[in-house]
Amino acid sequence: MTSSKNPTNDNSYFDAVLVGAGIMSSTLALLISEVLPDIKFLIIEKLKAPGSESTGAFNNAGTGHAANCELNYTPLDEKGNLKIDKALSINRSFERSMSLWASLYESGKIDIKKFLKFIPHISFVSGQDNISFLKKRFQKMTDNPEFIDMEFSTSFDEISSWAPLITKDRNPSTQIAATRIGRGTDINFEALTKEYLSLVSLNKNVEIRYKTELVDLKKIDKKQWELEISSEGRKTSIRTGYVFLGAGGKTINYLQKSKIPEAKSYGGFPVSGKWLICEKKDLTEKHNSKVYGKADIGSPPMSVPHLDTRWIDNKKLLLYGPFAGFTTKFLKQSSYFDLFSSIKKNNIFSMLDVGFKNNDLINYLISQSLKNHNSRVDNLKNMMPSANPSDWYLKNAGQRVQIIKKTEGGGSLKFGTEIVNSSDGSLSALLGASPGASTAVSIMVEVLEKSVLLLNDKHNLQKKINDLIYPELSDSENKSIYIKDIKKRNNSIFGFHP
């Protein structure tokens, strides 16, 4: 059945068009299909398969960001006070993602074994100042039900039992500390995307076109957009009432083409990445955790090193990094002109201002780009002293485009994700990077709620969303019980026993 919004059954008209077939678009597609099954919508993807760019298993950290171990989510303010608001927000958002997966798994719609593994998340530091910071973080975070199961240790032997490769060949007299949460996860977002789209494709009102690229878009009247798309050299036009731009780093270029006023203040700063990877079974079997360190003072947030157990294509691997670099491409499979084509009269000064203000980032990217294999392994040895260069090889990770936003003082470089909505709710775009994928459900619920798709029956549709996943947590006296109930329910469905 086609939507009533398209009474002419025009094959070139869709109620919604989603650009990109990564974790963001597929999450939105899943929500639309579950909550608004009669909506006729189209997903277009430039590549020949879903989840092949930023969502690709090797192209993102796959950490299952829950702020369990990422120390950059709990910074110190100017007075030395620990700020955990961001960590709490990320953790709650990730639990909503877990709730959706639990609901879909319980109803037999997806197979969690294809994308989710439970694995401890560990924060590891050395040196007295860092140990004091980690202890302060532990004490403040465990006051909250989200992190009540966190453990803290300064015992060399106990930390060795948690992560033996971290302590092997390390001087036992070294001052070290670690926190551990057993209920961490490794998420293969590429596999999850494919699960979502396999489910969505069962809806006869949904069409997915691969090897199809957005060329241009423009608003043709108050209720419609016209999109020019290209598939294997053949250009066609389609019309829609709603557009979602979820094309990774390339989104900034598409957003600018839309010419909505809200797009004028944005630019993008591309950053590339590389992993050190180990496949040796005698090492992969000894490390069963994700271990995050602490960035050096003055280093950008993206410089936080981590040694991760990952399962990719049914194979257990160790990944260390990511090592950053600079490129003018916004996607791995796109053009070196991406950055230059994104420079406009309304953002050039903010982009130049960001360049002048962020010498530390520029220097960091240059130094990272100049590293050779041995120097990268030397970096790894700070976390894994026994690392041997011959056990590791280098692999390109994904591109990320950090947000540049115009401010009164010039420009600001933002680390995170941001939704840009047109004033009439007919277009949404997702910009930025981490912790994106892990919080995709909360982000896409927000996108859907602000879109024209929910205008006619917002209350009932929001109820449908909350029946599918737990609602956003609000401050209440029963916060502790609420969070415990959600985790208990999700653990039971997933078969996780703390």
Swiss-Prot record:
InterPro entries for this protein: FAD/NAD-bd_sf, MQO
Enzyme class: oxidoreductase
Keyword annotations of the record: FAD, Flavoprotein, Oxidoreductase, Tricarboxylic acid cycle
Reaction it catalyzes: (S)-malate + a quinone = a quinol + oxaloacetate
Pathway the protein contributes to: Carbohydrate metabolism; tricarboxylic acid cycle; oxaloacetate from (S)-malate (quinone route): step 1/1
EC numbers for this chain: 1.1.5.4
Keyword flag Oxidoreductase: yes
One Pfam family this sequence matches: Mqo
Single Gene Ontology BP annotation: tricarboxylic acid cycle
Transmembrane stretches, start-end: none
Entry GO MF terms: 2-hydroxyglutarate dehydrogenase activity; L-malate dehydrogenase (quinone) activity
The keyword Flavoprotein is assigned to this record: yes
Cofactor(s) required, per the database record: FAD
Similarity field: Belongs to the MQO family.
NCBIfam families: PRK05257.2-1 (NF003606), PRK05257.2-3 (NF003607), PRK05257.3-2 (NF003611)
HAMAP family (UniProt xref): MQO
This protein's name: Probable malate:quinone oxidoreductase
Species lineage: Bacteria, Bacillati, Cyanobacteriota, Cyanophyceae, Synechococcales
Gene that specifies this protein: mqo
